[in-house]
């Protein structure tokens, strides 16, 4: 097993996750099996109770693990399925060690950070690195480990110390360290500054880790003189200084690393059993990157949510939209709308914001209402859903978005003016959305319906069923405490709101579609978590197709895109492969 540790310096949020994912991608394209671990030095057990403003979105895994959004990057880049133990937090490690101490496993010893916490970290990494993450079930050969935060943070000290010991335990030829640092370029001088990187590497060396590659994040490509200066002061060869400047899309990052000889370096440094030249997989990335840069037509989607000031709050949603837009050869324009701005009360308090929000909504090609929690802004979302339904605008509601679509329909079509979710109005006489039996009101963490669940289609006459390849069922990831009340199902269906997908027991409403509408769909699950660059998520793909007016044509053709719309578009591509790469959708395994 080979281990690659990715650390960061100067500032957090520098792009360690994308660098780690890209390193994994180029190694996977060389034929290796790659897994990844994300270490978060916070004391929370998991990311489940975070505010989206605090740490971005909460990413959900197959096993129900609520984890850091970087694990979403790993899954999308490497097309793998991770588990909750691939996200290691200080809280998890301390809980693990304290539980062992309570059981008497330390035989009366004084339990300390060194060696007990550091040993537990090393054991966890070595154990988790061997868990298969690919569909073929083979054991990984390389484990990419991203250490969150920046070098020097007091929280990450036990982890740095653990890896200082770890490099000797697994031997030098099996461990290497990539250090990601910032090279700022102040606008006043226009000169690229190396001092932050020098200080960051010096601090890392002082803690006992020596970087093998120094990856410099910068706005423009590094000058040769700057590279040589970093090489001299950071005690690495010039070819070990890698420049990752700002690029048009993240699909370019693996290509950027490969062009600078990263594969050759790993080949020598880690003695990897691979060919020098990454093959077919990187050609797909090159095609995607080239294709992304050539897009001319634009499709605009109004994203009506609560956390729109911070795009990381909807990271997977945005990626799912991008994957689908790329698949139909369109540039994506997301119009972020704070749902509270659409509410009538805003028209009195801040009329300009109110009119700007409605202007954005009315000018969009499609409307998306993603998941969320809490009552703030829900009336604005209901207004947006009503507008999309009445104006025949393509609409997708995810999780809370689906629940509010049912609330809106109940109020405006069935005439139940007080219809609501018991989350927002516990005393309503028409509780069309109710909390689930699993929900434990006394505790917040881990009390939701989480992870991959099966949904069965109830009818053959369904747009969503066709988008999923006419399958009998689908398996997607969930994260919710509330659900549509099955008591009102008959009343809603009689008026045209059809529940075309339900859970295996037939008790939970999973997919809703409106008759006589171009595309009005709600899903209780979160399809964005399984979207991949080459395998877009069907609900998002349907929304994008409907938004550009191509959905009915696509369904008539048996759910096949025209050649100009698939990844077989090879204009300007020098790929040696002759086969056509069809667009794929999440695999449905029939038992």
Swiss-Prot record:
The modification Phosphoserine is found at residues 562, 568, 571, 573-575, 578, 587. Residues 562-591 are annotated as: Disordered. Its main location: cytoplasm. PROSITE patterns: GATASE_TYPE_1 (PS51273). The keyword Acetylation applies. Belongs to the CTP synthase family. This is CTP synthase 1. It comes from Homo sapiens (Human). The lineage of its organism: Eukaryota, Metazoa, Chordata, Craniata, Vertebrata.
